[in-house]
Amino acid sequence: ASKTCPSNTPLSCHNTTVVQDTCCFIPSGQLLQTQFWDTDPSTGPSDSWTIHGLWPDNCDGSFPQTCDASRAYTNITDILTAMGADDTLQYMQTYWKDYQGNDESFWEHEWGKHGTCITTLDPGCYDDYVPTEEAADFFSKTVSLFKTLPTYQWLADAGITPDGSKSYALDDIQSALSQQHGAEVTLGCDGKTLNEVWYHFNVKGSLQDGQFVAAEPDGAKSTCPDDVYYDPKK
């Protein structure tokens, strides 16, 4: 299990001095839960966005990547099964999809590039460490966070549903999602078509057990034009 963290740990990106205990504090503490809306080819259910990943940015918007090649695991399905994370795996098989159909290599990429850069997942941050358990924690946390961010439902509640024949004001989409999230979000487009959203968080404590707090984006809020298309999945 991961080590217990003190309750007075500062919120990431809000510390005034360097925090030495990186098992209970993430220096790259702007965490982004990123989601796809894939329509061509489509992935996942027609009434849900899908998981892209969980990314640690530095507080200035830059980001580390591929931080430990020795832990770039290549058997995520086996790891999750061995660690008893069957529910997480089953959920990922529906909601964490690769548009080219190779989910396993997509998961390996997300773990190796981003997961290995989250300091609280370092093997030294565990009591009685079992090899690969930190990867299971990464995927389980990403899934549980994604479940709290139902983009499709939040947009539908604001009257914004996929429609191939009309466009929506980007401001209306931003407003609907930021009101629910508690901070602005980052919206991504392919041309004029909405296809990605990033929810930003800071964390008090570890990734495994800490508190995620909505945070303002650490960069541009959008790559989209003022009016966008939100296409139905094919």
UniProtKB/Swiss-Prot annotation:
Q: Which residues does UniProt mark as catalytic? A: 52, 110, 114
Q: What is its EC number?
A: 4.6.1.19
Matching entries from Pfam families are given as: Ribonuclease_T2 (PF00445)
Q: Name one GO molecular function term.
A: ribonuclease T2 activity
Nuclease found in the keyword field: yes
UniProt-listed GO biological process terms: RNA catabolic process
List GO terms (cellular component aspect).
extracellular region
Q: Which residues are glycosylated?
A: 15, 75
* S-S bonds: 5-24, 13-59, 23-125, 67-117, 189-224
Keywords for this protein: Disulfide bond, Endonuclease, Glycoprotein, Hydrolase, Lyase, Nuclease
The task this protein performs is described as:
This is a base non-specific and adenylic acid preferential ribonuclease.
Q: Which family does it belong to?
A: Belongs to the RNase T2 family.
What is the protein named? Ribonuclease Trv
Query: Which organism's genome codes for this protein?
Result: Hypocrea rufa
Please name the taxonomic classification of the source: Eukaryota, Fungi, Dikarya, Ascomycota, Pezizomycotina
